[in-house]
Amino acid sequence: QTLNVIGDRWTMLILHELLVGTENFNEIKHNLSGLSSNVLSARLKAMEEAGLVTSTLYSAHPPRYSYALTNAGKELEHVFNALAIWGSAHLNPCYKEVVDAHTEEAVEVVYRTKDTKAITEELIIRPARIEQ
């Protein structure tokens, strides 16, 4: 289900552009060479329908929109950080690393239980408990 929302060829790259502050359609298109206007439009529309992005009309003639991440979209920054941490460990060279803002020490992904905040390393993925 999650991969249906963010797993296609361009969506993660578009999300990354929005996370780093690119808001304008043409700037996003320029920064992602090879991405056609119609594909970018379709991806932005799908991301808006999924609740990841909002669009704001800033010019009526011709119509131009700026794009911003919703809170749900901003929460995907953790996914990008985890990918960058993985890249630091497994890609040579890796051009990005995730570090503590104050100490500049490398960081790692840690999982905590939601209620007790206990750190855990043993994870399972199971069907969600959906309340009716």
Please annotate each region the language model reported:
Residues Q1-L35:
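N-terminal helix-turn-helix DNA-binding core of bacterial DNA-binding proteins
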Residues T2-V5, L18, G51-T54, E75, ...:
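Short, contiguous, well-ordered secondary-structure segments
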Residues G7, S59-A82:
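Basic, amphipathic "hinge/linker" alpha-helix immediately C-terminal to the N-terminal HTH DNA-binding motif
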Residues L15, E23-I28, L44, A72, ...:
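Extended, folded domain segments that form the structural surfaces/walls around functional sites
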Residues N26-Y58:
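Canonical helix-turn-helix DNA-binding module
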Residues Y58-S59, T103:
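Short polar/acidic secondary-structure junctions
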Residues N81, I85-Q132:
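C-terminal regulatory/oligomerization modules of transcriptional regulators
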